[in-house]
């Protein structure tokens, strides 16, 4: 009997059973082969007895599949006659009196039957634990391999610097790239792509998170696409500058390598001239030093002419102007780069790129690390950019301002549209409508012709008509069916309980970090469940600090901050995205964050924020920035918070995802307080604007557009 049971179990479990330790398989088989074992309805008894073990041993992927497997086991065991028959109910021949045959003596309690040992022995549990650790090590190894590949790719990026040499070949104009493919990790992102970048045009690259926008930019930066001229300077602003003792200003100036070398040579020659200054020989003949001095003077003259030709003397002013536009004060420009945070070093990288003016500039979310003042300056600067650039951005208004064309990446294809993002959206919508109409018309024609052909195919009298229909069907133009992107969703859970107002209250609260000056004085405000607030102000003014005071991560130096004992606060920031375990997958990450919660419940919650299907099982290092943000949102909102504190929540999301985020925030049944400079997000999801400046918080009476116009007029 056990041999038959063994063959059935291995047949149902298939290949996965071969990877399970023998003691565990023996235990499962012996439990199911017991002659008194009751499989129950649809294998429920088997699920109760060995279901947890099957999942733990990875014989099945989850409990849902486990139920199906247990049902199959029940059926298979039944076909082999190994299932205990269900007892039938028979009618009694005559009534029975329940007290017949019973004496009045005390009833002896039946001793409980000995229960089998634990489901698994300690040895078996240890084996399962070792298997889990082995899987963790394997995931970590794959992640480290991915990191090494990325570092190698970055190391392979060509060094780009200011190019003053216009004599080495013709100037770069239009760039034609035809029939190219882009893939990563064996997955095709662009297939048979073709695109022409016209000189001086400003392109916005749009598409869903994970479609391959950043990878496409990297391919171009590495000249990995045929059609890019070898002498074309391409600069991809992707990573922050490495911090060292070089000042921010000098870091930008150092990109002009020729200028730097000429200035260094000038200093060396001047020093040498001072050392060798001596009168001529007594006989009036020039000495060796005099001849060398003449040569040095001649070289100095050449250096000065070249420095003048390459505008070397205006370079410092140009670099300082760019840094100032990106919110660097004169004092900050003279600070060492290793004293700046990652966000500020990213600004220095952007400043270097703008100073270099490459033939093709590639910008990936350039506004992520900028405040509104810097964004407005960058908009103006890029609008006047004389060469070609491609920008990826989630900021709709930014794209509307700076781009002249849109490149749309969808379904592994690239399409180009004239105009800004709003024009693209209208054009694309009309195009999709027309394509759908053409497809439906074509299908109706095909169906009508095919019906005629099928009806009269064997009718000799209509043979000629049938043949003409067949030829017409072959000639009928093929129209592709419209494949729409799946709808995005951000469904934030509704809190079960609602604490009374105010849930957060500041009363004369002041704050300063230990040993430093007060950043805020006498703050007085309250936040309720119906609050919809956006805080705006320059970077470094303390907006994120206020969010930490609200959440309780920081305590006021004086005054009080009241928080309702029942309030649950969720905080989203770039720190939460950066803190994800990239070697894990979203589902496993959530299971570790919330142990004991059923897998299906966690899957459902991930799905409510757009992390569905296979995406929930992909290693997180393969996810795009926007997809990682969704996982971070899932983690912080699982406990059904009453208040969402959001620090730049739209960073890394694509434009459709920002739209879905707006809808999710509008429907959220709780309070919202965000820090953002995204005009579309703020205008669509909040109704209060707070301006942070000079250690105070003041309400702004107007729209975000009004605030933006006020800033523009002041600069």
From Swiss-Prot:
Residues binding ATP 1, per UniProt: 207-214
Domain ABC transporter: 175-436, 504-713
Keywords: Acetylation, ATP-binding, Nucleotide-binding, Repeat, Transport
Binding residues annotated for ATP 2, in chain numbering: 537-544
A GO CC term attached to the entry: nucleus
Pfam families: ABC_tran, ABC_tran_Xtn
GO biological process, one term: defense response to bacterium
Residues with PTM N-acetylthreonine: 2
Spans through the membrane: none
Region (Disordered): 96-118
The keyword Cell wall biogenesis/degradation appears for this protein: no
SMART domains with a match to the protein in the record: AAA
Gene Ontology MF: a single term: ATP hydrolysis activity
Domain of life, per lineage: Eukaryota
Family: Belongs to the ABC transporter superfamily. ABCF family. EF3 (TC 3.A.1.121) subfamily.
Descriptive protein name: ABC transporter F family member 3
UniProt source species: Arabidopsis thaliana (Mouse-ear cress)
